[in-house]
Amino acid sequence: MREKAEKPAKRKLTRNQRKQIEAVIRQAKGDGKNHTVQDSIPFQNMFPDGLCRLEGGTFSKTIAFEDVNYRLAGPEDQRSIFESLCDFYNGYDPTIGVQVTLDSRSGGSAADEMFGIIRQGNDLDPIRDEAVDILRMQYKRGNNGYVKTKYVTLTIEAENLPAARARFARIETDTLNRLKVMGAAAHVLDGKERLELLYNILHPEGGQFAFEWDWLPASGLSVKDFISPSSFHFGETRTFRIGRRYGAVSFLQILAPEMHDRILTDFMEADGNIMVTMHIRGINQNEAIKMVKRKITDLDAMKIQEQKRAVRSGYDMDILPSDLSTYGGAAKDLLTDLQSRNERMFNMTFLVLHTAETRQKLEIAVSQAASVAQTYNCLLTRLDFQQEDGLMSSLPLGLNRIKIERSLTTSALAVFVPFVTQEVFMGGDAMYYGLNALSNNMVLLDRKQSRCPNGLVFGTPGSGKSMSCKREITFIMLMTQDNVIICDPEDEYSPLVKRLGGQVIRLSPSSTDYVNPLDINLNYSEEENPLALKSDFVLSFCELIMGSKTGLEAIEKTVIDRAVQMIYQPYFADPRPGNMPILGDLMNALLSQHIPEADRVAQALDLYVNGSLNFFNHRTTVDISNRLVCFDIKGLGKNLKKPGMLIVQDAVWNTVTINRAIGRSTWYFVDEFHLLLKEEQTAAYSAEIWKRFRKWGGIPTGATQNPKDLLSSPEIENILENSDFIYMLNQAAGDRKILAERLNISSEQLAYVTNSEPGHGLLFFNNVILPFADDFPKDTELYKLLTTKPSEVAHETVDDEKEDQNG
């Protein structure tokens, strides 16, 4: 007897999910009358893997691709992108339809959510509110709140679903590889992503897309019910209604003999919701050649007729109508291209979709686009009586119902370059770094998502180095729970640190803020014995104060290491603050060895233990557990500044190791970074930080006006190699040349760091290079805290007054 198969358990929907489904059902039913909105959307099925069945045996898939730095590329790089674009189109045979979609639409009210700044009910809320206002203003001022996306939709014919999937597996791989060659990151949209894209197009007024695949059986709805607008109205000749919005679809008549590669860019820079669609289908090569030969034959026949007419009329038979001569020569050139120059023929339909809140705004947007078309000797013509077909052909489904086509060769087609500039617009803890100088889109990035989040800020004095660091510090404090430590050689950060509730530690012989250079915690090293790394620091410290050009001798290193082992034994036996050793303990441990080399090191330490520079011979008296700590080392004299910077670095390492244990990131900002690179010991320690911090959740940033110092030795050069974030402001001529060679900067890109305004420059992040402009609003409290211009700095006390000489 066969057992009954056990029915799978029904998935219980949450209350919120039931509400969302009921809302969709209400929208689908409307007022009880028959509605055909769903029937208008021209596809039959959407599958979870992103495969879509259109009409009959037609299937499509959509790939989203990112922008490429085309505008700022040099002539050779632009030529390379153009040739790659030619190869991209030539790679599709006539059985594959290609639809390129460029979409620009309002980001809506979701903009505030991107900034991630939420009121906390404390003293920083006024700054949070102002920061959100500034970001909102920059967002609207930059790209007017429009988000630009790019897609390519591929269409094939197949007998069934498995056959379609098998063929798309190869086509997808080839497409992704071709886009990668051009430098465009791309990914295949799954079914839910395609539905969300369609939802956003069909709901130009905005809204939240709500859909899960397992809702379909429970609700009895189809996927179209989740993406359909409330209504379509195609009763007018030249416009249509979609929900409460007005729309219009136009087609581009290409009249110019040659096109410019900026036409798509200019269309997409227009205000308003706009979507440009290019439907492209290759023509069989043999058919294309036959077609051109027929044209040549027809032109030759016309030429013969004109010559006969000339003989009968008694004038020179070589005098022909100019159009006939022109077309005849062009047709022969085209035949040569098709037969010997790797050119193919394509049919293209060019559609432009506009949507707007009112009819008046719609007409303004369409007229702006028409002006762009006229600039390039083209006509943008409304699709009279074909608005529904135009809208459905604009959807990224791969279906073209508009049979107004223009035949183009591969080169003529590739002139429609869909690239402008790369964008950095990330989610998560992404922070504001300015506006893209080419697209005016906001630059939002999260350095923690980078392979190597270490950073460098380059700029001449007055270019905005310190202000950019302060802006980043402010947003870290407002948006994350991370720790921030600042090494401040010029006392420029104190007002900001105080306002953000941080702690300023003033290191100077007259200060009572003490930091013990021998502080250690049990997590100080990833090895079992934390003394190994601490001993390395003590060796660097002793080498620095002894001032030996040849470094420590082997015996000196041995006696120092032995002393380090001795002085930490009481602390590790009983780890309480009172047992933490100080420099005096180290000197005594050296003297107790009764070895000349140990005595020599002890004598060098004496100045820092019993002499006038005994500032560091104390246990730590300040609490560096505050989220924001600034080490002000301006008051350290010439003899104390070098060891002081080394000690600050070690204190930073201590904090990083403590935070790693609790899963918290630690940001470390070093202003006037070149001061650390001048001394061998601090430079070596800096290189070690840049090499090791990433594993421990540390994110160092060095700001300097002398980038050439980073190339002074192979060891220091690693700092540049290990920095995936570079914020480059105005550069001196010599530094520009060095950086251009080292970072492969084109002359077009270099113009953005040549005599540039404060806050303007180039941003390097991972593999992206983009020009930015950060014009921070001056009539704000934040600006007064960030600026370092002497005429604009507001200080609370006389001690806080200072001049900014280094940007």
Predicted regions and their residues:
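P-loop NTPase motor domains
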Residues: 68, 75-94, 101, 105, ...
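Conserved lysine of the Walker
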Residues: 465
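Extended, folded cores of ATP/NTP-driven motor/assembly subunits in large transport
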Residues: 1-421
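Hydrophobic anchor at the beta1->P-loop junction of P-loop NTPases
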Residues: 457
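A short helix-turn-beta junction within AAA+ P-loop NTPase domains corresponding to the substrate/partner-engaging
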Residues: 501-506, 715-728
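Hydrophobic positions on the alpha1 helix immediately C-terminal to the Walker A/P-loop
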Residues: 468
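Conserved P-loop NTPase
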Residues: 743-798
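Post-Walker A helix-loop "phosphate-sensing" segment adjacent to the P-loop in P-loop NTPases
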Residues: 475-485
